[in-house]
Amino acid sequence: MRDPRGPRSRAQRHEPPIKIKDIFALFRIRSYVLNTAAMTAMTFAIGGISFWLPRYLFDYRGADFGDAPNLGRINLIFGAITVAAGLIATLLGGWVADRVQRRLPSAYFLVSGIAILLSFPAIIAMLRVPFPWAWILIFVGVFFLFFNTGPSNAALANVTPPAVRATAFALNIFIIHAFGDAISPPLIGWIAGKWNMDAAFVVMAAVTLLASIFWIWGARYLGHDTLLAVESTRQRPGEA
């Protein structure tokens, strides 16, 4: 992903220690906050689907696999789909977002928001389409869940000043995992126990809509916040 700020100067390599106020200042960057919220929702969905989908297919859709469904084989196929779809989507998502970003400053968020929106119908349809055709929908759903990986992380870097960028990434990683894939498996399990697994997958699909809303909402701030990060870099005292 292209970094709009260019190389760091000699002065920037000797930054003063990060202060608590610098960390709290990150929460005043609207595109950073909305990006983190969207990535949390995305991670929640990925964590829940990764944990529960093989078991769902074995317990609820076993008849689609013949008289003797094999959980190991289901895990193997799903794992292969996740690796292939995730890798292709990550590379293609970055390439598409970079091309669109040349004309549209908000492209990183718009590409992320539209892509994850497309995962919603694939996840819902997977619940009703018989196998082996449902594997195609699973591939499509996983593909669009990972399509945002490049652009969302590039946007994260672009809106944070270099002096706090590592801290911004660390805080983002903590939040998206603590409130994303760390809690989604037990929460989805609770929903499945109270209602059923179909309802649990509808909830996971709905969370992808929430991620889409956050990214599309944040698109209006992304260009402005990127420019502010550039200006904050240029105005740092003692810079060459």
Predicted regions and their residues:
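Extracytoplasmic gate region of multi-pass secondary transporters
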Residues: 29-91, 145-149, 153, 180-185
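Juxtamembrane intracellular "pre-TM" segments in multi-pass secondary transporters
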Residues: 6-36, 63, 236-240
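A late C-terminal transmembrane helix in Major Facilitator Superfamily
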Residues: 159-195
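C-terminal membrane-cytosol helix-exit motif in multi-pass small-molecule transporters
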Residues: 1-10, 214-220
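A membrane-interface helix-boundary motif in multi-pass transporters
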Residues: 67-71, 107-110, 190-208
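Interfacial helix-cap and linker-helix signal at transmembrane-aqueous boundaries
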Residues: 57-58, 96-97, 101, 187-196
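Multi-pass alpha-helical transporter architecture, strongest
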Residues: 122-129, 202-239
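C-terminal transmembrane helical hairpin of 12-TM major facilitator-type secondary transporters
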Residues: 103-152
